[in-house]
């Protein structure tokens, strides 16, 4: 993830930088690398929902300025918040990776995540990301989760795990099995 998420806001709020210029510089400096952005679905990079035409234009502009992969997610895993951004990203011809926000609750079972991955595949996702932003995914749970998702859809799967608990490397190694 080279752009998007909080980097856009941080450029403006804290660094007095133009986030679009930053993206263009990244693209120029990394001509042989794909630049991925983290996109909060209908929230784009902000903290509220935006109108569909704003979503469309933002995604189109991001693609034109150097984004190659759109990693699209909703923190609550609500597909309704992802549908428009996904359509807009697919229209650019860029890679669309839809992310599952991993959480540990009685509701969040492997079947729930597998069903979500199937929905994302139906939306036209090119790949799935298990986004473990709190670092709570354990190795054997990752193994079982990847198996469940692989049964639900035939898309490449990535794991993005933070090292908060120190388990990220072991988790990713077990998930690869």
Feature map (PLM): residue ranges:
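Alpha-helix-loop-beta-strand connector modules within alpha/beta enzyme cores
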Residues: 12-38, 85-101, 142-159
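Glycine-rich, proline-tolerant flexible connector loops at the mouths of alpha/beta enzymes
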Residues: 1-23, 41-47, 70-81, 104, ...
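Catalytic cores of alpha/beta
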Residues: 111-117, 165-177
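Aromatic/hydrophobic pocket-lining residues that form the small-molecule binding cavity
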Residues: 19, 23, 55, 82, ...
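Conserved anion-binding
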Residues: 84-117, 123
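Glycine-rich beta-to-alpha transition loops that act as phosphate-gripper elements at the mouths
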Residues: 37-45, 101-107, 156-169
């Amino acid at each position: 993830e080279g752009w998007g998420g909080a980097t856009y806001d941080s450029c403006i709020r804290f660094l007095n930088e133009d986030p679009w210029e930053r993206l263009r510089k990244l693209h120029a400096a990394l001509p042989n690398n794909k630049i991925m952005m983290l996109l909060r679905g209908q929230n784009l990079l902000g903290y509220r929902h935006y109108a569909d035409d704003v979503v469309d234009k933002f995604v189109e502009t991001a693609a034109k300025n150097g984004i190659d992969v759109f990693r699209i997610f909703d923190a609550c895993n609500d597909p309704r918040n992802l549908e428009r951004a996904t359509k807009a990203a697919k229209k650019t011809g860029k890679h669309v990776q839809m992310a599952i926000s991993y959480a540990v609750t009685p509701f969040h079972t492997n079947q729930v995540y597998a069903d979500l991955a199937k929905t994302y595949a139906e939306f036209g996702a090119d790949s799935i990301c298990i986004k473990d932003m709190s670092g709570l995914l354990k190795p054997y749970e990752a193994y079982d989760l990847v198996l469940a998702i692989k049964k639900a859809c035939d898309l490449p799967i990535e794991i993005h795990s933070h090292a908060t608990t120190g388990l990220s490397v072991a988790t990713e190694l077990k998930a690869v099995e």
